[in-house]
Amino acid sequence: TAALRDMSVTRIVLTAEQIAEQAVTREIPDYYERDRRIDAVLTHRIWGLPVMLLMLMVIFYITIAGANYPSQWLSEAFGSLGEVLRNGLISLSVPKWLESVLIDGIYCVLTWVTSVMLPPMAIFFPMFTLLEDVGYLPRAAFNLDKYFSRSKACGKQALTMAMGLGCNAAGITGCRIIDSPRERLIAVLTNNFMPCNGRFPALITLIAVFFAAGASGAVSAAMLTGMIVLGAALTFLWSRILSGTVLKGMPASFALELPPYRRPQIGKVLVRSLLDRTVFVLGRAVTVAAPAGLVIWLMANVHAGDSTLLAICADFLDPVGRFLGMDGAIILAFILGFPANEIVIPIMLMIYMGQSTLTEAGDTAMLADILGRNGWTWVTALCVMVFMLCHFPCSTSCLTIKKETGSWKWTLAAMAIPTVTGLAICAVISWAARIFGII
């Protein structure tokens, strides 16, 4: 039985500790006691989880505060380079439509994705890798293990969830650390409930405009942490549902080793986080962003009568969007943002403003004015944030799921699970808002 197995493992570990105490000589006699004193706080039955959430909020605050200016500088630099390239094409007498396709379509989307993704990843991934190198991540898995046990999933899934905060594709690949095929598949199917840093800018922007206007960055970080907690709760819920239905089974035995705390090797941390994670993820995103730019340009510039294809599709989807507390432009932006979540908000603005290329609002006041004139309320913003948290994975993540599972069936399931969840929650929010006369 499980109880007998746990008892046997406990006895083996205690015996091994007794043998080690008699046979091992330590250069630093009190290192074990030092680690245990730290663990008494970080893995405490009551305080361990709040401390973990506080650390997460600090990481988000540093990422939010640190990424703003580099993103702006990159955007301005790419804008200047775009004008140089445009002038070069004009000097070569390139047809106007081809110039617009290359610059306003492909180049604009590529550079937008890069300027939005690169700075947060360059900050988040090193901090994440630093926690990994120090030895904290196994403690985080320990804090969450009881919740995964109740969900009949593996505690190692906590590590893949943390990786998903940087990039869901990286988190899905990280599911290889889970030995059980059943539990590994559960982790893959639910990883998208963790918002990646491609979704952070949209969440942060909407929080700043509708919920934390004039407040400090700490308020935005706290609200963003709240969205992470909601994503984690949905992960536990769906892990339990999958474990009790299509992926039945008991959780495999999980021996979680808490390694000693160690001094991080900063050089290796930077190289591993920037090259193995940041550059890898950015390369995949850029690869799929180029064809997306072409499709978006075509829809924004091809007319049927007096309207563009973009406007026609938005009008067609409007009844569905209204039912979900949003509108057709928002739904279409999510669909066209399938290659990269970073371009969802710019596509919305492009539709609202009738532009033929991706549009930047400039500042939160201007964005609030544009959204307000198009019927947005705090309920709309809340529904968009929920759907940003719970919708189909981006194309990079979908390709990674297909590669890891070897099945289009499970890839479609990974797309359907968060999307159905998001649609249901948005419908409930919209229904409740109508019942109470808010909208």
Residue ranges, per PLM feature:
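Alpha-helical transmembrane helix bundles of large polytopic membrane transport and channel proteins
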Residues: 1-28
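Core alpha-helical transmembrane segments of integral membrane proteins
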Residues: 42-138, 142
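Extended, low-charge hydrophobic alpha-helical regions
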Residues: 68-109, 151, 171-187, 294-419
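Juxtamembrane inter-helical linkers in multi-pass membrane proteins
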Residues: 78-88, 138-173, 248-273, 321, ...
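Hydrophobic alpha-helical transmembrane segments of multi-pass integral membrane proteins
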Residues: 110-137, 144-172, 289, 319-353
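Transmembrane helix-loop junctions at the membrane interface of multipass transporters and ion channels
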Residues: 197-223, 396-407, 428-439
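Alpha-helical transmembrane segments
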Residues: 221-238, 337
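Long hydrophobic segments that form regular secondary structure
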Residues: 244-252, 261-318
